[in-house]
Amino acid sequence: MSKIVKRKEKKANDELTSLAEKIRAKALENQKKLIEAEKEGGSESDSEEDATAEKKKVLKSKSKSTVSTQNENTNEDESFESFSELNLVPELIQACKNLNYSKPTPIQSKAIPPALEGHDIIGLAQTGSGKTAAFAIPILNRLWHDQEPYYACILAPTRELAQQIKETFDSLGSLMGVRSTCIVGGMNMMDQARDLMRKPHIIIATPGRLMDHLENTKGFSLRKLKFLVMDEADRLLDMEFGPVLDRILKIIPTQERTTYLFSATMTSKIDKLQRASLTNPVKCAVSNKYQTVDTLVQTLMVVPGGLKNTYLIYLLNEFIGKTMIIFTRTKANAERLSGLCNLLEFSATALHGDLNQNQRMGALDLFKAGKRSILVATDVAARGLDIPSVDIVVNYDIPVDSKSYIHRVGRTARAGRSGKSISLVSQYDLELILRIEEVLGKKLPKESVDKNIILTLRDSVDKANGEVVMEMNRRNKEKIARGKGRRGRMMTRENMDMGER
């Protein structure tokens, strides 16, 4: 009997191996066609030179931006050709050159001048527009003259975004001796307390963990804070950080404090927050409605029932060699699809809320370093993360609200680069897609599909998916068993303690 089982397992493994080989062969064929087409000049090059040329082309077209608020900036087309025009300290100008910041983006052109003058700022801009540097540059420029500890505090909704903001400050402040620290949940509080006692200039934090340290870390306070930044403020409020923000705002000083509020969208909650925390702010907006950048090509793929996994593998094969983020609605789907991709020899890693901080940063590092070409993620990755050169975004699950769609597809076509998004649409997603198209103000074109390849892949992909689901179920059972074992040991110890009493 065991021999029969082994033969069946061997046959299944052979079939999966055969599928992977077929996919690799098809991928090599696609790559060969692409190379030949490039030689003939018939297709766009994905080389770094072409990306740079595309970027320059986009930057040459003036961005139509608006500024309207309590303090009006009436020059709607104001722009700068270089950061030296902003009258920054030489060390900061050189850091911008080192980072290949060729010229200020529209939001930077709008926000940095009034920020340098000392105004509070409300910055509204679409994702990928350079919001982080828009508030980091004026803070660092002022810090060069003051050099005080606990000088600025930046609040971010997620641990990943906080870490990326820290990286931006460290890079821009590399020639200025800037000390920064990242204070987020999921990490050791004692280690963070020691970092705070070293009196960094810049603190980047999630609201909950910052409040923990303000209440419990001896010797730490923000009484002399000069700058407060709330980045992705709409997300902060969506994640119900409102009560914590209120407590933080009551603790930190209001006099001699400059406050910046940056967000992708303006809502009634944001308006309430800015009235509570900002004084006569300048509102700098380069986008006052949900929209996507012109360099993003958005399409959809109509998927028959039960074939979504097959269509996904079809896409991975068609776009082999491209960097891709696949968005799912659930953590379980993120794990399952990551496993499916890897089983079929597409290098993938998962990012979702069940991972601890080290696991999440590890997944991001693998993807950013190019060691994994596919990131399968829930919406935890959709906001604020600066992941360079993402070629394609795939919506495996359609988001339930249009705002989430905008933020997801905003992971590609950043900073003037071109990019593509593809949404897999089943019959149950039609209403969601109609809402998204209404917000975008256009119909999304359909992606073409080779039905013969779909039919060829179907059985093998279903079988591979079954293998992944079985493995996930096995791991879950082991996890539950370990949990019961621990609870059993704890109950035994409690019974022994009761016996002693």
From Swiss-Prot:
Residues 3-44 form a coiled coil. Its EC number is 3.6.4.13. A motif (DEAD box) lies at residues 231-234. It comes from the Eukaryota. GO terms for biological process: rRNA processing. Residues 307-461 form the Helicase C-terminal domain. Pfam families: DEAD, Helicase_C. It catalyses: ATP + H2O = ADP + phosphate + H(+). InterPro entries: DDX47/Rrp3_DEADc (IPR044765), DEAD/DEAH_box_helicase_dom (IPR011545), DEAD_box_RNA_helicase (IPR050079), Helicase_ATP-bd (IPR014001), Helicase_C-like (IPR001650), P-loop_NTPase (IPR027417), RNA-helicase_DEAD-box_CS (IPR000629), RNA_helicase_DEAD_Q_motif (IPR014014). The keyword GTP-binding does not apply. Keywords: ATP-binding, Coiled coil, Helicase, Hydrolase, Nucleotide-binding, Nucleus, Phosphoprotein, Ribosome biogenesis, RNA-binding, rRNA processing. Residues 36-79, 480-501 are annotated as: Disordered. One of its GO terms (molecular function) is ATP binding. It is found in: Nucleus. The keyword S-adenosyl-L-methionine does not apply. ATP binds at A125, Q126, T127, G128, S129, G130, K131, T132. Residues 491-501 have a biased composition (Basic and acidic residues). Disulfide bonds: none annotated. It is an enzyme of class 3 (hydrolase). Residues 112-284 form the Helicase ATP-binding domain. Belongs to the DEAD box helicase family. DDX47/RRP3 subfamily. Interacts with the SSU processome. ATP-dependent rRNA helicase required for pre-ribosomal RNA processing. Involved in the maturation of the 35S-pre-rRNA and to its cleavage to mature 18S rRNA. This is ATP-dependent rRNA helicase RRP3. It comes from Saccharomyces cerevisiae (strain YJM789) (Baker's yeast).
